[in-house]
Each structure stands twice: as structure tokens, then as C-alpha cells.
């Protein structure tokens, strides 16, 4: 602060005005030192000197401007979408536009403003102010930052008995809060005194949770409502669906009945993009997918059984352990099962059997993560056993890309929301792997040891800068990745698209080749079977010939006996057989026996001729 003091004096009191001029320096007086006084000089040693040890203090004042902070809301209506219209739904936006364009007020306003804006529109069309004149020149290469990540905060389970952080969910407005579900998924190993609470954490206060959610059973999943940030949806360990409203407190606001709920833990819950913002669906290891409306959550709206044989039998259903839904594909959803099979379903199908569209086989164990690429929905990521795989809906027999088999089991995975070629995976050894397909495809671009405990789940923030990882002991670690991993690179979309298309074409070629090989093997097997059938047919022919011979001789002897019986009936008196006839019959029987032993065939005419000759001889003999 400047201090000014004004001195007042009359001009007459100033005296005569000085007139200065430049001149050479001159010596006026020179006093020489006195030698006698110099001889009396004695140096004193030691000398006592006073010193001020304390710091010099002075009074200072500063006047600063104070900024007062307060929270306030603004209701912006003009130019925005209504609350019941989802901007991401193309059909809803088109329907709303058509409705507005038919309004008379809108037509009159456009007609009045058209003449005013016509001049400005012509100016904009005359010159392209956004034209880039040096776009063809090569850009100067800028050194990119190396991939890195650092720990920002750690949120620990406040309970004494530690539980697993099973699921994470970011606050939809600003991502200022993080909801964490805690549970013990080890079968029949949960302690009797284990607490069931789950928490909502403020990112700036890791010491104490902001809100505690108190369910009747431990929560396995927990999701924020994207349209109402005060509402949360949870899936319980006992199969029930619970709903909270943070404005009403920590207790459950809505709860499904046990009779109409799942029979096993609910591993997946997702909100649907509806007008009301109250519809959701869930999946469980009991093999059922259920649709709910939280306004009437006592029983589900619809149930689909995950029976890939399409017989709708619950005992044959595959247990669902992960769930995927993309808002741009409102009729489709995908389910990852315990058996390592991905089931693609269509909710709007007419029958229950038609709702299961196709299946993808690729993992040896449960599929813990399933997510579509946010830029290319036809490609989706699955994480299970020791690998992470990338699939295409056009190639169903095998995945188009996959990681190598790791030494540790993989527990979760997710795509980056800002970069189409980046995804994240967590492992049971506490490691977070960040994969960049543009930079490197065989190994992760960054592998970070987050903690010593096994990592169980992860969730990426919407802007891609922050990653939350939950461990088996309930510790949630918040990580911040470098700008190179959270910023869209130049031409990355085109590069990622070309990579996916190239691998899809390669898999289609391999599938066609394998199909041809299978057909050839099938033809060889069928040829061998035909040869075996011919050999068996030849053997069967000999057996049939022998059987035919036996049946033929049986018919002959039965016919002979019948004729003899008829001949005896025609004769009035029985006559004694002559020795000649007896000898003839014995000769016939001997000849027939010899023919049977030799394998020959005797005709009926030959037998009749022999019997006639025997009759003639009998007539010649006198009685």
C-alpha cells in the first residue's frame, strides 16, 4: 500500500534558485595520519558483541477477494430434448422431430425467421471458413507419452471381516462417486457375523463412505440408473432384486419377492434405455434372464430360459455369469455362461425358442466379462479361463483375436470408452493389463501390479482417464492412466476397423477350409462304411442261400408226404407194399440224402418220375 505525504511551503521561502554547472574535481583539504596516535592503537581480543538471535518480525496485512461457492441448478428447456426422449434412440428422435415440424407455431416461427437468416446462410455458403489449406502436407511427428498409470486413491472395506468387492459402478453425473458392492462368493464359506452393507464412496474422501446401502442379502452387483442418479439397482446373493433411492436413506426402497426371483446369486443387472427409466433386466446362474419394472418389482415382466437345446427346460439351462446390453441394439442382448459359451439372444422374437439366436464356443471355464466394442458393436470382448478373446458376429465358430494363455487366471475385462483398440484385463495375481492393439498385439502395452491380493473386478470411467479395480479383500484402487491411453489417436478408428475386418476375413477363410476338410473326412468315413456294408451283404447272401435250400427241401418233403397221403385215400383196399416199391422208395430216400449231403438240389419232376417207375414195376409183378 503506497503512503503519500504532502509538504506545503511558500515559494518565497525556497530561497535563491540554484544554478549548477559541471567542473573538474579539486582537493580542498588533506589531513595526514598522526604516527603517535597510530602507536597507541591496540587490538582488543576477545571482544564482547551483542547479537539479536530472534527473527525480525513486522506486521503485514493483505486484503484478498473471497470466492463463495454454492450449488445451484438450472432448468434448461429451450433447445434441449424432453425428459421422455432419449437422444441416443434414433427412432424416438425422428418421431419427436416429425411431431414438432407439424406444429403450427414452429412453422410460423420458421417462416418469420427465414427471411432474417437468409442473408447469413448465403454468407456461410459463399466461403468455407473451416477450409484447411495445408491438409495435404505431412504433419510433424510429435513424440507420444509412454503408456503409464498411477494410483490416485485407495478405498478399503471398513468392516473387520473383509469381503470381496464384486462389482463397481460410476456415478452417471460427473463420475464424482463410486458405488461398490461387497459380498463373499465362496460357497458356504461366508462367516456368520459378516456384514451385508455396500457403500457409495466420494472420490475425494477415502476415509469414510458417503452412504451405506443395507440389503437383506449381500450384493453381488450394483448399478446406477443413468437417468436418475439417486436410484441404484442391486442383485442379491439369494437371487432377489433390490432398489435404493439415496434421497430416502440407506434402507431398501423396492424388493422383489423370493417366490418370483432368481434361485441363485444374481451376477448381472443392467438398466434399459426406456422412456420411464424404470425398466431393467437381470441374469443368474440358475439359467434365467428376467425383465423387471421397479415400479412393480414384486414379479418379473418376462422370463427367458437359457436352454440352448430350445426345449425351455430349466434343468438343462446354462448358468449366466455375465450380461451385456448395447443401447444402440435395443432388441439384442448377450449372456456369458459358466460353461464358457456365449449366447446371443433376441428379446423381440415371437417364441421362447426363437429368442436364442446363436452360440459362440471358445472358453474352458466361466466367462466373467462380456462387452461389445463401443465403436464397433459387431465385435465384442470375452474374458474367461486364462485368455481374453475378441469375437465378430459374422464368425461364430471361433474368435478372431485372442491373448496368449497367462499363468494367472483372468477375472474381468472392459473396453476403453474413448479408444476403440484399447481394452483392460485384471488377473488373480493382482495385475492390471492394458492392451493396445495398434501399438502391440502379442503383449500388453502396460502391465501394472496394483496390489498383492487377487483382483476381482474393474470399471472404466466414461472419459477413459480413471480405472477402478476391486480386490478379493475389498480394497478398491483408483488409477489414472496417461493421456496416450485416454486420448483418441490419429486414424485409430480406421486402423482398428481394418484390423477387425482383416481378422474376420482370415477366420472365414479358415472356417471354409475346415468345413471342406470335415466334408472330405466324412466322405472317407462313409466310403469305409459302404465297403463294410458290402462285405456284410456278401456274408448275408451265403446265409440266405443256405436258409433258402433248407426251406426248399422242407417244402419238397411236405409235398411228397401230402401226395402219398392222397394216393392212399384213393385206393379202396390197402395193399401190401411189394418189395420192389419198398426198394424204390428206399432208393429215392437214399438219393435225396446223398443230394442233401452233397449240397445239390433235386427237382420235383425227378422225384415223381422215380415214383411212377416204381408203380409200373409193381403192376408187372403178379399177385
Curated annotation (Swiss-Prot):
CC per GO annotation: 9+2 motile cilium; axonemal dynein complex; axoneme; cilium; cytoplasm; dynein axonemal particle; external side of plasma membrane; glial cell projection
PROSITE patterns linked to this entry: WD_REPEATS_REGION
Residue stretches of biased makeup (Basic residues): 570-579
Alphabetical keyword list: Cell projection, Cilium, Cilium biogenesis/degradation, Cytoplasm, Cytoskeleton, Dynein, Microtubule, Motor protein, Repeat, WD repeat
Cystine connections: none
Distribution of this protein across tissues and organs: Predominantly expressed in ovary, testis and lung.
Entry function: Part of the dynein complex of respiratory cilia.
UniProt protein name: Dynein axonemal intermediate chain 2
Native species: Mus musculus (Mouse)
Top-level taxonomy: Eukaryota, Metazoa, Chordata, Craniata, Vertebrata
